[in-house]
């Protein structure tokens, strides 16, 4: 955030209106390069992101945009430019990456001023993915049904640009965005989310998607506030929630006449809404009839107000006690935990059956093994195989890669109720590492294990125990139950590539 404040040379009063000149500044592309480089370190291997953003290519791009009538790159031109010597697709990726940095500046400044004004303490902890699970443990055990919503994508690119017009007043920037979207992204590739992310800059795509989702979530929050005045203060530090609450006064005037006759359908103070990736969950204590009304409300809202094609099959009603929700790399469900209590009163004794609801979080072992299979760590049955592409590296580098992946998965899935699935994932990675080393040295697995002895095995199995012993030095050595319990971390801000199997 300090970098933005140093680099911005525009007038404070006009900062939100004129962002287009920043596209000609080299430091914008440097910030985009640093963001992509740091993000690539989170995943398994570096994809060579830094090779695309050399200073020479950036200067050539700025000169080309600065020259008159040279910004527009015709679709009839050859993909290889003889003068610049680089593909036009590379320039489009650089423009989208730079625009992603620019368009976030007004929102980042507003978020910074909001957090300073409210004096929100430890706001970074609330950005952790694991911070939502303690909330689910407290709330979901009292709820009955949940809507598993698959959010539809806009059918036209102009819808995304129009959604951004409310926040970015710079017409030139919007024209540049519209040009980039239409020139380098056809309609078929945008409807399919996986293809669109591969063509567009992922950071820009997520920003446009979140800005569009903010529109219909504003209406939902208006209905939510009409039925209940409860408001979560912990979510106030999130960027999207700031604009949700800011639009409530406007929505009361515009949408009250449209929804006032139907508000009685949604009178429920126990409604919890969570959006993540391309999905959303609406959990409530309502009956199945009222949840079915919520289902068709979402479909009608998308079709008639936001022109997004949606079907009722994209919204599923799940009973929490019978079905599991595939949520952020966990299978979450409400499990009934029966307990028997014996009560003694004078000479009479009573046996009381007490059943309590508890949130159960398990690892989706089948999908995770599928991700490991695609990454060539095992076959489709979960049997470990060697990683031939890593066999050319040194032994220490190979071991460090496997240990780092194992540590990241263990760190993310530390909140699992059952550790057996996590042990199986460790087993696959451990023997995949052994087979890779044996393949490199042209030896058998058994002979190579004898050479490594037990020190190699301890690197895979004692990582969490070492961490827990540092956090809880007194409790850990007296009880092993802490290691078998669920631990939620507040430093996880992204999902590992193997966990994000969708």
From Swiss-Prot:
Its main location: plastid. One of its GO terms (cellular component) is chloroplast. GO terms for molecular function: RNA binding. Keywords: Chloroplast, mRNA processing, Plastid, RNA-binding, tRNA processing. Belongs to the intron maturase 2 family. MatK subfamily. Usually encoded in the trnK tRNA gene intron. Probably assists in splicing its own and other chloroplast group II introns. This is Maturase K. The gene is matK.
């Amino acid at each position: 955030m300090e970098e933005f404040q140093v680099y911005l040379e525009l007038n404070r009063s006009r900062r939100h209106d004129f962002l287009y000149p920043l596209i000609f500044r080299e430091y914008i592309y440097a910030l985009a390069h640093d963001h992509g480089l740091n993000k690539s370190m989170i995943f398994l291997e570096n994809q060579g992101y830094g090779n695309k953003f050399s200073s020479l290519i950036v200067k050539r791009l700025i000169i080309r945009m600065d020259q008159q009538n040279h910004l527009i790159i015709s679709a009839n031109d050859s993909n290889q430019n003889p003068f610049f010597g680089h593909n036009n697709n590379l320039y489009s990726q650089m423009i989208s990456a730079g625009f992603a940095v620019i368009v976030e500046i007004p929102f980042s400044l507003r978020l910074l001023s909001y957090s300073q004004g409210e004096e929100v303490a430890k706001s970074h902890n609330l950005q952790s993915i694991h911070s939502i699970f303690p909330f689910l443990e407290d709330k979901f055990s009292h709820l009955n049904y949940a809507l598993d919503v698959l959010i539809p994508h806009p059918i036209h690119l102009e819808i995304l640009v129009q959604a951004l017009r409310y926040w970015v007043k710079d017409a030139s920037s919007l024209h540049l965005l519209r040009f980039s979207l239409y020139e380098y992204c056809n309609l078929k590739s945008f409807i399919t989310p996986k293809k669109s992310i591969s063509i567009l800059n992922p950071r820009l795509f997520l920003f446009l998607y979140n800005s569009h989702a903010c529109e219909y979530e504003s209406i939902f929050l208006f209905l939510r506030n009409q039925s209940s005045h409860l408001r979560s203060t912990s979510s106030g530090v999130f960027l999207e929630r700031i604009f949700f609450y800011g639009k409530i006064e406007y929505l009361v005037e515009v949408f009250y006449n449209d929804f006032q006759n139907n508000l009685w359908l949604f009178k429920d103070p126990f409604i919890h809404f969570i959006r993540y990736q391309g999905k959303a969950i609406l959990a409530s204590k309502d009956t199945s009839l009222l949840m079915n009304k919520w289902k068709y409300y979402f479909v009608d809202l998308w079709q008639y107000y936001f022109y997004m094609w949606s079907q009722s099959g994209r919204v599923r009603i799940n009973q929490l006690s019978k079905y599991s929700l595939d949520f952020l790399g966990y299978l979450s469900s409400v499990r009934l935990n029966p307990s028997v209590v014996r009560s003694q009163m004078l000479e009479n004794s009573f046996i009381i059956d007490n059943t309590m609801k508890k949130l159960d979080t398990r690892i989706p072992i089948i999908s995770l093994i599928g991700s490991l299979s695609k990454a060539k760590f095992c076959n489709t049955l979960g049997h470990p195989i060697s990683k031939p592409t890593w066999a050319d590296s040194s032994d220490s580098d190979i071991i460090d890669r496997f240990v780092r992946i194992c540590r990241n998965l263990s760190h993310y899935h530390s909140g699992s109720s059952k550790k057996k699935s996590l042990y199986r994932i460790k087993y696959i990675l451990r023997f995949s590492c052994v087979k890779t080393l044996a393949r490199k040295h042209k030896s058998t697995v058994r002979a190579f294990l004898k050479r490594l002895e037990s020190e190699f095995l301890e690197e895979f199995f004692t990582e969490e125990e070492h961490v827990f012993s540092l956090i809880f030095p007194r409790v850990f050595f007296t009880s092993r139950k802490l290691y078998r319990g669920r631990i939620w971390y507040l430093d996880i801000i992204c999902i590992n590539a193997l966990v994000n199997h969708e």
